[in-house]
Amino acid sequence: MKEKNQVVPDEVLSKEFLSQFKTEADVSKFLKQLHAQVLEKMLEGEMDAHLGYEKNSVTGNNTGNSRNGSYPKKIQTEHGESVISIPRDRNGQFEPIAVPKHESRGLSIEKLVISLYAKGMSVSDIEEEMREIYEIELSTSAISIITNKVNQAAQEWQNRPLGPVYLIVWMDGIVFKVRDNGKIINKTVYLCVGLKQNGLKEVLGMWVGKSESSSFWMGVLTDLKARGVQDILITCTDNLNGFTDTIRSIFPQSSTQICVVHQIRNSCKYVVYKDKKEFTADMKNIYNAPNKEVAATELDNLEKKWGGKYPYAILSWRNNWDDLTVFFQFPLEIRKIIYTTNLIENLNGKIRKYTKSKLSFPSDDAVKKTVYLSLMEIEKKWTMPISNWGLIMNQFMLMFENRIQI
């Protein structure tokens, strides 16, 4: 006998209930309303989980966050357009999953699982979330099958063609604990972020390695070139020995600026806590100077004041002076992008937000999968060019007119 596919029990579909439907259009209208109502209930469940208590519960008193009404949102469904109420919290921290921000369609189960995984949840956490909030039974093996599909997407993303010219490329890494041959060790996910000619940022790729070296970065830069990058006007890096020469061997015309933020942090390692605030303020006079000559004078002043007490904090400035002061070749607006827009540090912080629940990863693939999903979430918000982009782009074109094609 053919098994009935009963989504709704027969006792619910009574004659009285069915009498309201006269045409197929009546059924479609009902399903449209039902779909919207179910989504709203799912979102309320998400808000309960986010706040840690149900609506009107006294356990929510003095918790530091609470519901703050809702706002209407248009969504597209197979039954047409609907308007649903999206709940919001007082602190503005609620991120709906069933109907994500900036999207007009609810998520399928597969996309819902991947979205939860991107938030840093483990497979077992997702299983519990799906059961308790969405009342959907999914085994851990089924969830793993879904999340493993991310590997293919990440590989395709990593191998995608890139643009021929990037105005600036920032290079840095973020450390994770990863299991390797039965041991938990530190591994670094290295990232390259490019600034495009339209003023938007783009993560060019990620590479996992045990230790940073000029030969490792040689492989990264070779990969970028193989994927279509012909020229990088300015590169911003940390102070790795041989890094500048490595970059010039692949992109010989590129100007390399050692990251000032890394330099400040490196110098402060040699300064005791009670002096750090004053020492940092004095260092600021160096990179805020109007030109390289004044900056050199400010470095001399720093050495006169602190050199006797902290010689090694000054020495790294001296040893890397030329690569630390490349930004003085450029107009003020471009300088600020190079040395004050701490883009990579900001990106790393957002990745940490998505991965904070993971104490360690079972493999390189696992960490790459999680970082990839984090990057996809982060890049959704990279929709606006850098401030004053029209002026900045004109300055780039004047300085690099033979290397930029519009």
Where would I find each of the regions flagged by the language model?
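Short, conserved DNA-binding cores of transcription-related domains
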Residues: 1-100
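Acidic/histidine-rich catalytic cores and adjacent linkers
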Residues: 3, 252, 285-406
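RNase H-like nuclease fold core
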Residues: 63, 87-90, 98-103, 136, ...
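Alpha-helix N-cap/N′ positions at the starts of helices
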Residues: 105-109, 278
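Short, amphipathic alpha-helical "recognition" segments used to contact nucleic acids or chromatin
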Residues: 108-120
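DNA-recognition alpha helix
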Residues: 124-135
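Conserved beta-strand -> loop -> alpha-helix junction used to position metal-binding or nucleic-acid-contacting
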Residues: 234-241, 246-284
